[in-house]
Swiss-Prot record:
<dbReference type="InterPro" id="IPR002155">
    <property type="entry name" value="Thiolase"/>
</dbReference>
<feature type="binding site">
    <location>
        <begin position="251"/>
        <end position="253"/>
    </location>
    <ligand>
        <name>CoA</name>
    </ligand>
</feature>
<keyword id="KW-0630">Potassium</keyword>
<feature type="binding site">
    <location>
        <position position="277"/>
    </location>
    <ligand>
        <name>CoA</name>
    </ligand>
</feature>
<dbReference type="GO" id="GO:0046872">
    <property type="term" value="F:metal ion binding"/>
</dbReference>
<dbReference type="GO" id="GO:0003985">
    <property type="term" value="F:acetyl-CoA C-acetyltransferase activity"/>
</dbReference>
<keyword id="KW-0496">Mitochondrion</keyword>
<keyword id="KW-0809">Transit peptide</keyword>
<feature type="binding site">
    <location>
        <position position="212"/>
    </location>
    <ligand>
        <name>K(+)</name>
    </ligand>
</feature>
<dbReference type="InterPro" id="IPR016039">
    <property type="entry name" value="Thiolase-like"/>
</dbReference>
<feature type="active site" description="Acyl-thioester intermediate">
    <location>
        <position position="119"/>
    </location>
</feature>
<feature type="binding site">
    <location>
        <position position="374"/>
    </location>
    <ligand>
        <name>K(+)</name>
    </ligand>
</feature>
<dbReference type="Pfam" id="PF02803">
    <property type="entry name" value="Thiolase_C"/>
</dbReference>
<dbReference type="Pfam" id="PF00108">
    <property type="entry name" value="Thiolase_N"/>
</dbReference>
<dbReference type="GO" id="GO:0006635">
    <property type="term" value="P:fatty acid beta-oxidation"/>
</dbReference>
<feature type="active site" description="Proton donor/acceptor">
    <location>
        <position position="406"/>
    </location>
</feature>
<feature type="binding site">
    <location>
        <position position="273"/>
    </location>
    <ligand>
        <name>K(+)</name>
    </ligand>
</feature>
């Protein structure tokens, strides 16, 4: 027994030394890599059943990925992994991100992952890619999001056909726009937020009008054009159609705003089709790399990723979740809200942005300065990547920008970048 005890003690001593050495070796490793945005590209955003409706999300994703790689000016085989957000995946076939990646001409050996965090999917893809690059798992990655809401199918339950027939369900509503906990539409959650923060319909309509006018001004000034990867649509027996401008922001009649009926709450409702985002098609992609890779490849980055964070609240309060993610960013970066030159808060509904402005106490003039999803459109898997990419283009050198987006289920994601 004494011999056995001595042997056990020796083993414990050896294990303790090994653990100590492991900790010491780990602690001596280099710090996290800095991650930069080398390029950002997106397709135009198409209206529901509009100009891009003939193309699946995966094709739109391919166009955005290819443009991001080309604009970074690097060989396609330098991209070692791809993350793409996509929410409404039914009927697209296996592994949508893989389809988009190979369709963009990237190497067959490129691993891919499809991310679904509802409306935050595109942004979460950027965050996950940044983590992988920071940790040194990869040196060059593409991240973004894609959605073709025009091509989302209907479904019916499997099983014996019941008496009276079967019920078809719209998967846009079922998988994209319904709070599964409270069994209500996202718009009802928006109405709850409007009531909680005393935000009137008039305020929401006014915000929506500003969104449209800002989007038009940004397009008219040429500010958005450099983000766009044109989409070519082949026509049988006719010239190809080349789509190179957002479709939604031009489809508006301001005189109808005050006359529209509320959609989700009949009595004392505030949310209408005019002050909400629309159903849309589009894709966005960012090429991310470490600064070491940027130096090796002679790439001049657009911006660097400073910090990112998620937050979660009660599912019905999902519209205000970004206000809980943003303080985490500022704390991590050692910045104050006054240091932020540009805010992009996704306009799922006008009330989302108005409520977050109130909660964060930020200057409305710095929020969605060039329009947002109410006017440009909201392809739900794309939008999070779009607003990060837009900031990377629109900020001026040395400025900081924060992009935040809410997602169904009570979540939000946010990213802080600095223009280089």
């Amino acid at each position: 027994m004494a011999f056995c005890g001595t042997r056990t003690a020796a083993r414990l001593s050896h294990s303790t030394r090994a653990l100590h050495n492991t900790h010491r070796n780990f602690a001596s490793q280099r710090t996290l890599n800095e991650v930069v945005i080398a390029s950002a590209a997106r397709t135009p955003i198409g209206s529901f059943q509009g100009t891009l409706s003939s193309l699946p999300a995966t094709k739109l994703g391919s166009i955005a990925i290819k443009a991001a790689v080309e604009r970074a000016g690097i060989p396609a085989d330098e991209v070692k992994e791809v993350y793409m957000g996509n929410v409404l995946q039914a009927g697209q076939g296996q592994a949508p991100s893989r389809q988009a990646t190979l369709g963009a001409g990237l190497a067959i050996s490129t691993p891919t992952t499809t991310i679904n965090k509802v409306c935050a999917s595109g942004m979460k893809s950027v965050m996950l890619a940044a983590q992988s690059l920071m940790c040194g798992h990869q040196q060059v990655m593409v991240a973004g999001g894609m959605e073709s809401m025009s091509n989302v199918p209907y479904c019916m339950s499997r099983g014996a056909t019941p008496y009276g027939g079967v019920k078809l369900e719209d998967l846009i509503v079922k998988d994209g726009l319904t709070d599964v906990y409270n069994k209500i539409h996202m718009g009802n959650c928006a109405e709850n937020t409007a009531k909680k923060f005393s935000i009137s319909r008039e305020e929401q309509d006014s915000f929506a009008i500003h969104s449209y006018t800002r989007s038009k001004a940004a397009w008219d000034s040429g500010l958005i054009a450099n983000e766009i990867a044109p989409v070519t649509i082949a026509q049988k027996g006719k010239p190809d159609i080349i789509v190179q401008e957002d479709e939604e922001y031009k489809r508006v009649d301001f005189s109808k705003f005050p006359k529209l009926k509320t959609v989700f709450q009949k009595d004392n409702g505030t949310v209408t089709a005019a002050n909400s985002s629309t159903l849309n098609d589009g894709a966005a992609a960012l090429l991310l790399m470490t600064t070491e890779a940027a130096n090796r490849l002679n790439v001049t980055p657009l911006a660097r990723i400073v910090a990112f964070a998620d937050a979660a609240v009660d599912p019905i309060d999902f519209p205000i979740a970004p206000a809980y993610a943003v303080p985490k960013l500022l704390s991590e970066a050692g910045l104050k809200k006054e240091d932020i030159a540009m805010w992009e808060i996704n306009e799922a509904f006008s009330v989302v942005v108005l409520a977050n402005i109130k909660m964060l106490g930020i200057d409305p003039a710095r929020v969605n300065m060039n329009g947002g999803a109410v006017s440009l459109g909201h392809p739900i898997g794309m939008s999070g990547a779009r607003i990060v990419g837009h900031m990377a283009h629109a900020l001026k050198k040395g400025q900081f920008g924060i992009a935040g987006i809410c997602n169904g289920g009570g979540g939000a994601s946010a990213v802080l970048i600095e223009k280089l």
